[in-house]
Amino acid sequence: MNSIDDEILFIGTAEAEHVEMYLKAIWHLNESNSPVKISTIAKMLHVRQPSVVQMLKKLNTKDLVEYNKAGVSLTENGERIGSSMMRNSRLLEVLLDSALKVEIDEEMVCGIEHHMNKQFTDALCTMLKHPRKCPHSHDIPMGECCENIDSN
């Protein structure tokens, strides 16, 4: 009865998570009206500046950012992914803090947020009654499930 065929395992791609973290960092800088600088991104993500430059070039070729001498900005696709990652993260923080009454573990939140699909995120948002703010008082980007809901 206990067969290896009963268990389905997945190996996530670190590359996809790295892309999402860069987009989330840029999205957060935009949200806070901070300049999007290589040094700031490097500091936020605890990486070296050459790593940021290399990733920004990659994101530029994937049409997720516009990166040139003038600076860095998110494309429509980059904005969508960055907003989605921030939504996932902040909803998880509300879950931990308000619903489960446990201390927010940012590393755990970061690990989970990359694996949340739209159905799960919308169900979590609905279960939490469509919160508008995370425990840190930041706005939670609205999803389609929030469109017909009055502001809390």
Language model: regions and residue ranges:
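Short acidic, hydrophobic short linear motifs in intrinsically disordered regions
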Residues: 32-42
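Short, hydrophobic-biased segments on the C-terminal half of alpha helices
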Residues: 56-57
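A short, conserved structural fragment
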Residues: 60-70
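Basic, amphipathic "hinge/linker" alpha-helix immediately C-terminal to the N-terminal HTH DNA-binding motif
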Residues: 70-88
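C-terminal regulatory/oligomerization modules of transcriptional regulators
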Residues: 111-152
